[in-house]
C-alpha cells in the first residue's frame, strides 16, 4: 500500500530479465501496479529506460533477490498475482537446487497473495515445467491450477523468442491460491 496507494491491482514480476514484457504490460494495463524484482543490474537499467520512454508511473523496481523481498519487504495479502516468465531453468543436475519454483518458495510466497491471487509461469524448458508442476502438486493444499494456453495478454519475451527459434515448446501454467 505504501508504494502503490492508488492502485487496486498489484502484480509482482519476478526475474523480469531485460524488462521488455514488464514495460509492455505496464503500458497496456496502466490501472495495474507492477512490482519488478530482478538481480541482473543491466536488466534493471534497461527497464528503467523503457519505462521512462513510455512515461509509465505504474511500475516500481527492486534490484534485489526475491527471497529477501518476500521475507523483508512484502506485506501479507498484498499481491493480486505473480508473473514468473522464463525463469532460469538451471539445467545442470548440480544446479537444480537453485531453481525458484520449489515447494518451499511456493509456501513462502503464499501468504503474500490475496485470496484468489494467482501465480502465472511461462517456460520453454519442458523439464522445468515438469519440475514446477511437481512442486505445485506437493503444495496442493495451497494452490489449484495446471498448464494453460498462452494468454493473449502475455507478451513474447526475448527469451521466449530464443526458445521458439530452437523449437522449444513453451508451457504456460496458472495456479490460484486456495
Residues of each region from the PLM?
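Conserved beta-strand signature within the Rossmann-like core of class I S-adenosyl-L-methionine
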Residues: 115-123
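Short alpha-helix immediately C-terminal to the canonical SAM-binding loop
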Residues: 44-46, 129
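Class I SAM-dependent methyltransferase core
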Residues: 13
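A short glycine-rich, Lys/Arg-flanked "PGG" loop and its adjoining helix->strand segment in the class I
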Residues: 101-115
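Class I S-adenosyl-L-methionine
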Residues: 131-178
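Conserved SAM/SAH-binding beta-strand->alpha-helix loop
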Residues: 40
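Glycine-rich SAM-binding Motif I of class I
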Residues: 19-23
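S-adenosyl-L-methionine
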Residues: 48-76
